């Protein structure tokens, strides 16, 4: 009986040993940084997953980093991350500039507006973000990303969608940042709104980015238009007939330095209540932006925008409908 028990124990030990040896073949990839990912994979596919998950080339400063914990398949070719990023800010205004949680110079009230309080204290937590990110790499699609995110900036501090898109083979399909933008040229700010005067908007789009040439990136996009303006009883803005078309070219000389040129062409449709007819007018926008490092700790950001009919795409101006053009054959403006 004792001999049989010993034999069974030896056989179990022999059976467990290969399993332990197999487990030792797994590679643990760990980063010491605060926003790192701990990932376990049987092969080098895990390296690719982490690279795709950490890519922030099409995100702004306030977008959350990759989640620390992921769900993966057995082969390490796909990963799903779900995370909640809680963000709170507090501010004190010593001169009563803007009665808003974000700083928009266009909202600075004129004297005699009825609010004579010069000091103001505010707190905000509505920019806390809940996001879901699914990444992977396949033979036919290459690197792909499916990303959805939202915060609580909706009416009454309700949940509001911020991003929902899929990326593969250079294409972006869904709701994301517009192509007439340069996210990398926007400096980091405590204020969620970001720098005024910069091109900043989100839209539903079909875009393509080509980075096959060394140091160069070229992009084209077809986007859902957003037309807004100041109207009167003779003019109204409703249905739009054509999408916006955007294009860009970017040259990079290192990972933190580039210069980018962009353009957008849009057809803006409005209805005349005088003529009982819809009219369209073509408008455009041009952009030049850059960011480069002077030293390791000194980064320069810059952006120049010029155009007609692009007020709804510019940060700050988009809050007050400052898109003006003369309506057809009338004295009205929109």
Name these PLM-found stretches:
Residues 1-26:
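Bacterial Sec-dependent N-terminal signal peptides
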Residues 73-102, 113-227, 246, 250-253, ...:
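Outer membrane beta-barrel
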Residues 239-289:
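Loop-centered beta-sheet repeat module
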Residues 59-76, 135-138, 145-148, 263-265, ...:
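Transmembrane beta-barrel strand/turn architecture of Gram-negative outer membrane proteins
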Residues 96-101, 156-162, 184-191, 229-237, ...:
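Outer-membrane beta-barrel translocator domains and adjoining extracellular loop/strand segments
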Residues 281-285, 294-299, 305-313:
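Beta-propeller domains
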Residues 22-94:
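N-terminal periplasmic/intermembrane-space "pro-region" immediately following the signal or transit peptide
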Residues 323-330:
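Conserved small/polar residues in nucleotide/adenosyl-binding loops
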């Amino acid at each position: 009986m004792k001999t049989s028990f010993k034999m069974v124990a030896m056989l179990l030990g022999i059976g467990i040993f290969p399993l332990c040896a197999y487990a030792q073949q797994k590679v643990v990839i760990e980063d010491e940084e605060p926003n790192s990912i701990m990932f376990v994979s049987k092969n080098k596919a895990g390296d690719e997953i982490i690279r795709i998950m950490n890519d922030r080339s099409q995100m702004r400063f306030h977008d959350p980093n990759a989640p620390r914990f992921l769900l993966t398949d057995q082969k390490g070719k796909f990963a799903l991350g779900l995370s909640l990023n809680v963000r709170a800010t507090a501010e004190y205004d010593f001169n009563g500039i803007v009665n808003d949680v974000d700083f928009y110079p266009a909202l600075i009230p004129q004297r005699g507006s009825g609010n004579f309080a010069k000091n103001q204290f505010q707190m905000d937590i509505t920019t806390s973000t809940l996001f879901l990110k699914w990444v992977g790499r396949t033979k036919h699609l290459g690197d792909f990303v499916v990303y959805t995110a939202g915060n609580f900036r909706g009416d009454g501090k309700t949940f509001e969608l911020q991003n929902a898109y899929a990326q593969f083979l250079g294409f972006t399909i869904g709701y994301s940042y517009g192509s007439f933008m340069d996210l990398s040229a926007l400096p980091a700010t405590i204020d969620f709104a970001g720098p005024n005067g910069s091109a900043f908007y989100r839209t539903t789009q079909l875009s393509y980015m080509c980075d096959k040439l060394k140091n160069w990136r070229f992009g084209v996009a077809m986007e859902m238009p957003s037309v807004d303006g100041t109207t009167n009883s003779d003019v109204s803005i409703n249905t739009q007939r054509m999408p916006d078309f955007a294009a860009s070219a970017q040259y990079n000389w290192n990972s933190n330095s580039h210069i980018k040129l962009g353009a957008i062409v849009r057809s803006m449709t409005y209805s005349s209540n005088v003529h009982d007819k819809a009219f369209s007018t073509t408008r455009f926008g041009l952009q030049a932006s850059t960011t480069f490092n002077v030293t390791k700790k000194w980064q320069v950001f810059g952006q120049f925008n010029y155009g007609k009919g692009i007020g709804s795409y510019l940060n700050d101006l988009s809050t007050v409908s400052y898109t003006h053009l003369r309506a057809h054959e009338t004295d009205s403006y929109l």
